[in-house]
A protein has these predicted regions:
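Hydrophobic membrane-insertion alpha-helices, especially the h-region
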Residues: 6-24
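Conserved beta-strand elements of the Class I
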Residues: 91-95, 124, 154-156
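A conserved hydrophobic secondary-structure block that centers on an alpha-helix together
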Residues: 116, 121-138, 144-145
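Positively charged n-region of N-terminal signal peptides that target proteins for export
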Residues: 1-5
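Membrane/wall-proximal cationic-aromatic binding patches
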Residues: 29-118
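Active-site flanking residues adjacent to catalytic metal/cofactor-binding acidic residues
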Residues: 21, 96, 158
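Residue-level preference for short coil/turn positions at secondary-structure junctions
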Residues: 13, 87-88, 119, 150
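Interaction-surface signature
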Residues: 26-55, 133-167
């Protein structure tokens, strides 16, 4: 009976340690080789305007639902196409929620990316999923006051769900 208890104890401890090591090492390994990029690493909190994208991302496997997509951000955390040079001044800034961000899509397939390439417009995408009018205002004020970015025009892409996000 004592052998069974000892075996059970050793088995439980070994299983527990294996699961912990598998979780820690496995997740780190997958992140390192770019096969997993969880939302907590992509979307980060921001003291000035709630949250934003992590800066300087270039990942092939950002996840939205069951889809993987390429995501690149610049040194300010703005979604962009990975190839453009970062600029300080733009003709038009577009801010909004998931539709503006183009969640689940690489930059080139978002409406901002298509306007930029097809119409040759000088645009920057400030959109992030679940943003609301309150966050739009905070982000725009912060970016302007700290001289992080300049733009001549802003398009605020508001949708009906944005109002709920502020409650």
């Amino acid at each position: 009976m004592k052998r069974i208890k000892n075996f059970s104890f050793v088995f439980l401890i070994t299983s527990f340690l294996f699961l912990i090591l598998d979780f820690i090492i496995g997740e780190r390994f997958l992140k390192k080789i770019g096969l997993i990029y969880i939302e907590e690493l992509i979307r980060v909190s921001n003291d000035q305007y709630e949250y934003s994208f992590e800066k300087n991302l270039n990942v092939d496997y950002a996840v939205w639902g069951d889809q993987y997509y390429k995501l690149c951000t610049d040194n300010r955390g703005f979604k962009f196409n990975c190839f453009d040079e970062e600029k300080k001044t733009y003709e038009i800034a577009i801010i909004g929620d998931s539709f503006t961000e183009g969640i689940g899509l690489p930059f080139e397939k978002t409406f901002v990316g298509m306007l930029k390439s097809k119409k040759n417009l000088d645009l920057v995408n400030l959109g992030v999923a679940s943003y609301s009018p309150h966050i739009y205002l905070k982000k725009i004020k912060y970016l302007i006051s700290k001289k992080i970015i300049k733009f001549n025009h802003i398009i605020v892409a508001v949708d009906l769900s944005d109002l709920e996000d502020d409650w």
